Structure formats: C-alpha cells, structure tokens
Amino acid sequence: MQQDVLELFSPATAEWFTNTFGEPTDVQKAAWPAIAAGKPALVSAPTGTGKTLSAFLIFIDRLNALARAGELKEELYLIYISPLKSLAGDIRENLRRPLLGIPREEGQEEIQVGIRTGDTPQKDRQRMIKHPPHILITTPESLFLMLTSKNGRSVLKTARALIIDELHALIDTKRGAHLMLSVA
C-alpha cells in the first residue's frame, strides 16, 4: 500500500518523504488519495500521526510541479485556518521541513508562505495584497476581515483549497459558526 500512496507524488517528493519519515502513517494512507482526487476530506486522528503532512503534502507537491513547469503564479492557492494565532507560526515552521527538504530544480521559484493574524503588521498586510503568498495561514477572525475588504477578497479569490485545523475546537462555538459562514 505504501508504494501506491507515494505514487501520488512526484519522485522528488516521494523520495524526500521516504528518506525523512520512512513509511506513511495510516492517516496519510487514507487521506492522500482523497485529497489528490480533489475530494473533501476530514482527517481526525491523535497528535503525532501525520495529520499536518496528510493535509499539506499533496498541495506542496502540486505547487512544486507548477513551479518546475514555470507556471506557478503569484497568487494564493491554499488557505490554512488555525484556531489560534499562536499556532500559525508553528505551522509555518512545520512547513519549512518539506519546503526546504524537497529538492527543487535550478531556478525553480520558491513556494511562499504567509501568515495573516491580528498580530500581522500593516506593512506586511499591504505587501500580501501586492504579492500574495501561495499558502496563507490565518485565523477565523482574520479570514473574516479579509473577506470584508475589497483588497482582501482580491487575494482570497484565487484560492483553490482550504484546510481547517482543529475543527473540533471551533465547531460548537460562536467562532465556529462565524467561520462556517465565512467559508460557505
């Protein structure tokens, strides 16, 4: 089964994953085919079972493929919603491992990751409007604020996928109801 699942990825990504982690976890084996097929996926598993990579690796692989082909545009492809702004930096750090570890071809554009929370300085918010990241890490409240501004909507309109982390912590709260309205 491992071989079948890793065949969803480019050789560079599959080799990086195997060299770094060995074998995919059961969570990854179950999630990757659905995500690769563009199906909605709900990944629920204990801490340390590879949920973050199960959510991100398909998208990183596809963004790298676009970059290798010279087709990676300066626009947003993926939105990642974290329930806490304190987790946003952790997620960006977790993404550094595959983003820096998966070999790129010479001259290949780097995948850009941006964070937009209540702590993001105004100059960084303005830069994000002119030069959107490929992956945006944000909170439910910051997503809502972006949706209510013309410039924010112009950044968000190109997104092709959405990851909501820790959904169980939000679902039965006012923040969760607000988030569901934002992503509807």
Predicted regions: what they are:
Residues 2, 8-14, 20-184:
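Conserved P-loop/Walker A NTP-binding site and adjacent catalytic elements of P-loop NTPases
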